[in-house]
């Protein structure tokens, strides 16, 4: 229904895919996944839009709900490389690629997850994996709204502000 309402209102609605890019204020954004056409274009979690932002002193990648297989495929066709911030895939489920996160080598890993969810997210294995690659886990269930910004001192350092502290 939303799609129909948007198009009726004159909005152009299309599926995002690798190669789409633009700017938003001082940020450059690039769609890394899914790949248009071919076998890499999928639906559901494996087809989650993955977007990279770069600007204002921070490089980040948002992984949607990509599971391990899709993360490996993304790495093969459009490796993001090192980033400052990663929005951890699929609420921190166990379906993650340790090698992919090691290659990201993010300073901060944002985990969007509901408190007391029945899925056990984020999983202990995901949290251990982030710890092992030096990524600070910042969780919405425990810390609430979180903001990451370049530190005033510069030098690539980041400042993390959380609604609930911790």
Which residue stretches match the model-derived regions?
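Non-globular, low-confidence helical/coil segments that flank catalytic cores
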Residues: 1-166
């Amino acid at each position: 229904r939303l799609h129909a309402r948007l198009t009726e209102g004159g909005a152009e609605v299309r599926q995002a895919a690798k190669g789409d890019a633009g700017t938003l204020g001082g940020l450059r954004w690039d769609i890394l996944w899914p790949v248009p056409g071919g076998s890499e274009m999928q639906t559901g979690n494996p087809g989650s839009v993955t977007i990279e932002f770069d600007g204002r002193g921070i490089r980040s990648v948002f992984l949607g709900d990509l599971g391990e297989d899709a993360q490996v495929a993304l790495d093969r066709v459009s490796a993001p490389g090192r980033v400052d911030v990663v929005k951890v895939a699929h609420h921190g489920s166990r379906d993650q690629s340790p090698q992919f996160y090691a290659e990201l080598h993010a300073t901060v890993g944002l985990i969007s997850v509901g408190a007391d969810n029945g899925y056990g997210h984020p999983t202990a294995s995901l949290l251990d994996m982030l710890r092992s690659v030096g990524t600070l886990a910042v969780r919405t269930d425990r810390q609430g709204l979180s903001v990451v910004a370049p530190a005033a001192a510069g030098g690539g350092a980041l400042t993390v502000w959380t609604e609930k502290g911790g």
